[in-house]
């Protein structure tokens, strides 16, 4: 989703800029009013160099994505870092470039990509708006009057299913891995992949777990338990 603002990068780093974009795109895509409901929003402030290195080893890249879809006639929106394949289209959108991927029936998948910042794109957008005003062909921001757009119920975020990435910094001792997996199973989170890297010098180990899909509710409850447990010195997920 492009560069962070040099003066105040907070809105870019905490995901709010992407959040604003996905709300506008949802309104355009689904012909709805801009949602005022809460959505899952997580930025990239907590991602560490270690996470980037691990993703690279797995053939993956970390990308901050805004996702919107209609589930059972309800609107689901989320913004959070995702692990994507290095070989995927979205995995190769870098630098100042932005990309929007749409999927529908029967049209399938469409991709739009372009620069999201810089003097060229910014001045082009401003000039386009000014010319529209001068020509007198101003249209409503969403094509039709906002009041004519329909409202839609929000999807319960806690019921959304997704995979989970966890990285633990633990004491290298017997039973720690078993303790962590037991906590995961308590919330019906099944493990898809485990990587354990020992640090013999400091008598510690790094454990990386990627789960199968599970609900946001299970993920949230499990993380709350892991953050407060003595199973790990540091938890990132």
Show the residue positions of the predicted features.
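Substrate-binding/catalytic subdomain of NAD(P)-dependent oxidoreductase enzymes
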Residues: 1-92, 97-99
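Conserved active-site and cofactor/substrate-binding residues in soluble primary-metabolism enzymes
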Residues: 13-21, 46-50, 97, 117, ...
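C-terminal, non-catalytic macromolecule-binding modules
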Residues: 109-159
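Short amphipathic alpha-helix segments
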Residues: 139, 143, 173-192
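Short glycine-/aliphatic-rich beta-strand segments at the starts of folded cytosolic domains
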Residues: 158-170
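Short amphipathic alpha-helices in soluble, non-transmembrane regions
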Residues: 180-184, 221-227
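Cytosolic Rossmann-like ligand/nucleotide-binding regulatory domains
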Residues: 187-206
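Single conserved hydrophobic/aromatic residue that forms the stacking wall/gate
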Residues: 230-237
């Amino acid at each position: 989703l492009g560069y962070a603002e040099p003066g105040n990068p907070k809105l870019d780093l905490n995901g709010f800029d992407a959040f604003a974009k996905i709300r506008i795109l949802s309104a355009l895509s689904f012909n709805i009013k801009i949602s005022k409901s809460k959505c899952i929003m997580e930025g990239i402030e907590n991602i560490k160099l270690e996470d980037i290195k691990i993703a690279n080893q797995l053939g993956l890249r970390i990308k901050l994505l805004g996702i919107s879809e209609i589930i059972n006639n309800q609107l689901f929106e989320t913004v959070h870092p995702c692990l994507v394949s290095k070989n995927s289209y979205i995995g190769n959108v870098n630098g100042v470039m932005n990309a929007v991927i749409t999927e529908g029936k029967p049209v399938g998948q469409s991709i739009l990509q372009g620069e999201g910042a810089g003097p060229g794109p910014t001045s082009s957008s401003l000039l386009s708006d000014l010319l529209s005003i001068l020509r007198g062909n101003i249209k409503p921001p969403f094509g039709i009057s906002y009041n004519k757009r329909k409202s839609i119920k929000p999807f319960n975020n806690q019921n959304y299913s997704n995979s989970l990435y966890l990285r633990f910094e633990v004491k290298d001792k017997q039973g720690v891995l078993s303790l962590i997996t037991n906590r995961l199973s308590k919330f019906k989170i099944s493990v898809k992949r485990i990587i354990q890297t020992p640090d013999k010098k400091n008598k510690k180990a790094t454990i990386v777990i990627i789960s199968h899909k599970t609900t946001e509710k299970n993920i949230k409850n499990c993380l709350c338990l892991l953050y407060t447990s003595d199973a790990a010195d540091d938890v990132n997920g």
